[in-house]
Amino acid sequence: MRVLGATAYLRRLYQALDEAGYGDRIMIDLGLVHEMDYYTGIMFRGYIGGAGAAILAGGRYNALCAKFGKDMPAGGFGIDVESVADSLAGQSRPEVATRRDTVRIALTKGRLEKKTLALLKAAGYDISELEAGTRKLIFTLPDSGVEIVLSKAADVITYVEHGVCDMGVVGKDTIMEKGGSFYEMVDLGFGKCRFALATKKGKDVYGGYKTPVIATKYPAVTKAFFNKKNMDVETIKIEGSVELAPLLELADGIVDIVETGTTLKENGLEVVENVAPISARVIVNLASAKMKKAAIQKVIAELENGLNN
């Protein structure tokens, strides 16, 4: 009943704001959480064009006043004045004015690039300049209001998180390892592979009293995997061929991306356990999801149509 009452209240609140002319500027996010635990009711965040993240945050916190001897309703918010000033200062720049009407998408170069471009083409976008093989890194797709930026996977997340790109296409492996503040909107279903734990045949990394040593390019993913098992783990970051580490007795096992498993078999390794599935995902900047809601929803709908073509 409390949930129904809360949603009914949100509905009435939205209707009141809509009647006041603010409906198209409001987005209700039932998944919004805050790092502070003193909020007792509705929470809100505010966004402004040109800022990559919220510039205002607050909410209702009745219980906080009671701690100071006043049992009464209360609410409040804080504003990041520096971010507001930076955003307003940039509004007059020509490139910023142009960006207001453009959805900029960061695409991952390399493994996902070919299939992402094929998806854009299937979605009806003119990608002839991208197909021409130039050394350019920023492309404007004709008659679409879409701009494409080509970058490394980890940089896709950086560009989207900081708001210089509105959307991004990146592998789930990068999302899991790097993390960040953004919306993960669509599983595109291509670039499929998996994270897996592998060892030399017969090696037991779960038994015994010794802390397992795992070599990997993905220490955050590895630690999270073993944490779920309530196990301590020592990770060694490897940039090259991770398969070498167990063969050289540097590590007890590896966590790496596996597609067919052929490389593992050829080096005398076997998959002990699958860690997580991986595929290409669409991510969206938190502020852009609000400020460019209609344009971004249009792009996502076109991409989803492209998947079905």
Model-identified regions with their sequence ranges:
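Positively charged, Gly/Ser-enriched RNA/tRNA-binding surfaces
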Residues: M1-R99
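Domain-level signature for soluble enzymes in the chorismate/prephenate branch of the shikimate pathway
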Residues: T98-N309
